[in-house]
Amino acid sequence: MEKRMKELVDKLNQYAKEYYTEDNPSVSDAEYDKLYRELVTLEAEHPELVQADSPTHRVGGLVLDGFEKYQHEYPLYSLQDAFSREELDAFDKRIKSEFPNADYMAELKIDGLSISLTYVDGILQVGATRGDGSVGENITENVKRISDIPLKLDQPLNITVRGECYLPRAEFERINTQRQENGEAEFANPRNAAAGTLRQLDTKVVAERRLATFFYQEAGPTERLTQNDVLNEVAELGFSVNPRRIVTSSMDEIWDFIQAVGQDRDHLAYDIDGVVIKVNSLAMQEELGFTVKAPRWAIAYKFPAEEKEAKLLSVDWQVGRTGVVTPTANLTPVQLAGTTVSRATLHNVDYITEKDIRIGDTVIVYKAGDIIPAVLRVVESKRTTQEAMPVPSQCPSCGSGLLHFEDEVALRCINPSCPAQIKEGLIHFASRDAMNISGMGPSVVEKLFKAELVKEVADIYGLNSQDFLQLEGFKEKSAEKLYAAIQASKENSAEKLLYGLGIRHVGAKVSKQLLESFGTIKELASADVQAIAAVDGLGEVIAKSIQRYFAKEEAQVLLKELESYGVNLSYLGQKVTDDAILSGKTVVLTGKLEHLKRSEAKAKLEALGAKVTGSVSKKTDLVVAGSDAGSKLEKAQSLGIEVKDEAWLLDL
């Protein structure tokens, strides 16, 4: 019986690969269904013999409690964007200055969601979202329901692959037609539908929506020599790989490829938002390295934004967490880049004045970066009104007088008790990059604020699960889950809290730099401007902003309240001191490490005071080389740079 079940699993997986990945089925649907039903029957009779890669796992049926966080072993980076031929030429010039013979691979930029799949001994173990690039969500049960993802590889490999999950246009239309018939809200575009589907707790819904994938990367060390080799290998392993790509050293040929793709864009079976250009040689990629956010060896050309005419009906003025008042246009609905748009940003009051935008105007609307709808300009030939846009003099939230500082383009409310600012501040405090309180999004904050359960961030920690049961949509389990998330956030390292406080000019990166230096928020709060400005050369603008914030009595009271609730005010990483063993040193990691994950090695080096970079240069002080180290090691040796091994790092 076990032999027959294995035979059925192998056959059905092969047939599924032919159908979904290769688009070349060798059996009829009826034959497939017959074998599938036989397998379902046998698995029901012998549940102890069900295989990990059985296609029956794709059907759904599980209802998940939620998604666990997942730490990526290798970060998922963003890409540098380009919007013109000139920017591509500048990229080409930079690459060719170091590697005159470099060639590139250009491929389609699928408009979907990044996913990472990890296989152990050839069996799918983890499927995860990109998240912030370092930490995503474990969505393994959902990716198992995507038909073109192999549950088992033909070889017993330990491998992590990255790709894009998307919803085909035909499937998007089918789902929206069905939702319309059911009286449900339609999805705005295929990307939103794919995102909502991947985060579904009901796996049956995921199986029904027929998501698809294209894979483009193997994470970590590989024996392949080029990006194109990687794609060929990934395809051979059974993953879907987009066939439309070119390899060339000529930016002229890449530009021709981009133009051809742009002409075909509307006729593809899926949405794309550009073309990705990568240095083809993996050795060159390694030597070029990364910036904080993106690889230096790749760039994403974004197609020019689609533009449409719409009538400007009215303007809403909205208050952000820093008091900036932003105008948003209400428009006659238009279809724009696959989305129905009826609202668009007008940026700020100076933009309205500069463009002479008026109520009743016909305006050109586009999507900035293919994401945010914005008003570009007025079609003056269609103007019917002579009245200038009315600009508010009072805050639409609290009624306080608005100020327009000479050095700012926006109106600003400076009332610290403004309800809109407080609500936006609470949303920011709970956000992923700040205190990361899962489940406390804008709608929940709105409900808490309306019920007068929170008026400032410290109030969040005075809530209990019973408080949430007062709110619409909460049941015992969801209330307990949110309460647990709040309690867990107390243990965050203090840079998360510092960022969450919303101090002007203090982002997530600056928060970490400050806490690495001062160790605790209390130490930072009592520091003078000179001491703060000296941290990594942050400067006086940031330093004065921090000092002004902590000089306020309400900020001092807030810190005491947070501490009384047990919120951690200390940096949990290792404080970097001037006498740290690697203080001021620039270090490069290369090769395969046997005992440490690359992220762990990087964290240890940074804790010892090092600045870890992705490429070797004359400014590099030290290279830590693992096995199979390539061109970076060779370059370090040619420059006479000190080289250490992993054992040295472990002993520190």
UniProtKB/Swiss-Prot annotation:
Q: What is this protein called?
A: DNA ligase
Q: What class of enzyme is it?
A: ligase
Instruction: Give the source species.
Output: Streptococcus thermophilus (strain ATCC BAA-491 / LMD-9)
The active-site annotation reads 109 (n6-amp-lysine intermediate)
Determine if DNA repair is one of this entry's keywords.
yes
From the UniProt record, list the reaction(s) this protein catalyses.
NAD(+) + (deoxyribonucleotide)n-3'-hydroxyl + 5'-phospho-(deoxyribonucleotide)m = (deoxyribonucleotide)n+m + AMP + beta-nicotinamide D-nucleotide
- PROSITE patterns assigned to the protein according to its UniProt record, in alphabetical order: BRCT (PS50172), DNA_LIGASE_N1 (PS01055), DNA_LIGASE_N2 (PS01056)
Please give the NCBIfam families that the UniProt record associates with this protein.
dnlj, PRK07956.1
Q: Which cofactor does it need?
A: Mg(2+); Mn(2+)
Biological role: DNA ligase that catalyzes the formation of phosphodiester linkages between 5'-phosphoryl and 3'-hydroxyl groups in double-stranded DNA using NAD as a coenzyme and as the energy source for the reaction. It is essential for DNA replication and repair of damaged DNA.
Q: Any one Gene Ontology biological process term? A: DNA repair
Which keywords are on file for this protein?
Answer: DNA damage, DNA repair, DNA replication, Ligase, Magnesium, Manganese, Metal-binding, NAD, Zinc
* Gene Ontology annotations for the cellular component aspect, listed alphabetically: cytosol
Q: What is its EC number?
A: 6.5.1.2
- Note the Gene3D superfamilies from the entry: 5' to 3' exonuclease, C-terminal subdomain, 6.20.10.30, BRCT domain, DNA ligase/mRNA capping enzyme, Helix hairpin bin, Nucleic acid-binding proteins
Query: What phylogenetic lineage does the species belong to?
Result: Bacteria, Bacillati, Bacillota, Bacilli, Lactobacillales
Which positions does UniProt annotate for NAD(+) binding? 29-33, 78-79, 107, 130, 164, 278, 302
Q: Which residues form the BRCT domain?
A: 577-652
